UniProtKB/Swiss-Prot annotation:
Organism: Enterococcus faecalis (strain ATCC 700802 / V583)
EC number(s) reported in the record: 2.7.1.23
GO terms under cellular component: cytoplasm
Record's protein name: NAD kinase
Catalytic reaction annotation: NAD(+) + ATP = ADP + NADP(+) + H(+)
Lineage per the UniProt record: Bacteria, Bacillati, Bacillota, Bacilli, Lactobacillales
Function: Involved in the regulation of the intracellular balance of NAD and NADP, and is a key enzyme in the biosynthesis of NADP. Catalyzes specifically the phosphorylation on 2'-hydroxyl of the adenosine moiety of NAD to yield NADP.
Pfam families: NAD_kinase, NAD_kinase_C
């Protein structure tokens, strides 16, 4: 097995990475940061997002696994004190993997530039600096509403527990092959009206946000900020690609949710 390790800049994560590398080498597991079969992130969820974007060109060939050293690790199955057990599992057990949906993001421009294409594991947002964003929301090429407010968030099921949850979106089980549109501080009064509720969109449907002409929009894809001029619209759908997580031990999704947000009684 060939393994790549991605860690954050925290000293604890660097120490854990050093220990993990030693254990892997002692067990004849090859470190390969170019063509790995397994990518191990050491840190928190942000580190795993970084690992995903670093290796998302190899999604059909790699699985991901997280070692938790931070304050919140929704994607991380292993703790930093379980390294020996983790390496033993890599050596003994045949890997099983669980796959989750990803978000296909396509930015279209007014000036004829080629579309820009991205994959998101958690979410993508559209905002407009310090001014009110105005955008027409199309579902399957039909106008659904005209949105006015701070912005829009479009999230995957696994991303539903991240930024989406903090702005009032629903938590979706990752087995649901769909994505979610959640408003960010929408304007709703007698003149301007939106649905005002999160919308769950099936994988067979697609979403396009057509923006009023302006040069101060910015789009995020997970932790990446993408500032672009002349954006005409942003299109979203469930991607053909999926992310695979190595599953050497099972943790029920709702147990993860409880552990991350509620804790023990």
């Amino acid at each position: 097995m060939k393994v790549a390790i991605v860690h954050n800049s925290e000293e604890k994560s660097k120490q854990v990475t050093k220990q993990l590398t030693t254990l892997l080498e002692q067990n004849q597991i090859q470190i390969d940061n170019r063509q790995p079969e397994l990518v191990i992130s050491v840190g928190g969820d942000g580190t795993l997002l970084s690992a995903f974007h670093r290796f998302n060109h190899l999604l059909n060939e790699v699985s991901f696994l997280g070692v938790h050293t931070g304050h919140l690790g929704f994607y991380t199955d292993w703790r930093d004190y379980e390294l020996k057990e983790l390496v033993e599992s890599l050596c003994i057990h045949r890997e099983k993997s669980t796959s989750y949906p990803l978000l296909d993001v396509r930015i279209r421009f007014r000036d004829g530039k080629p579309d820009k294409h991205f994959l998101a594991l958690n979410e993508s947002t559209i905002k407009r600096g310090n001014r009110t964003m105005v955008g027409d929301v199309f579902i399957k090429d039909e106008l659904f509403e005209r949105f006015r407010g701070d912005g829009l968030s479009i999230s995957t099921p696994t991303g539903s527990t991240a930024y989406n949850k903090s702005i009032g979106g629903a938590v979706l089980h990752p087995s649901i092959n769909a994505f979610q549109l959640t408003e960010i501080a929408s304007l709703n009064n007698r003149v301007f009206r939106t649905l005002g509720s999160p919308i769950v969109i099936a994988h067979t449907e697609w979403l396009e946000i057509k923006l009023q002409e302006s040069d101060d929009y910015f789009v995020t894809v997970d932790q990446l900020d993408i500032y672009q001029e002349n954006i005409a619209s942003v299109c979203y759908r469930i991607a053909d690609e999926r992310i695979h997580f190595a599953s050497y031990r099972h943790m029920h999704f709702w147990h993860r949710v409880k552990d991350a947000f509620i804790g023990e009684d």
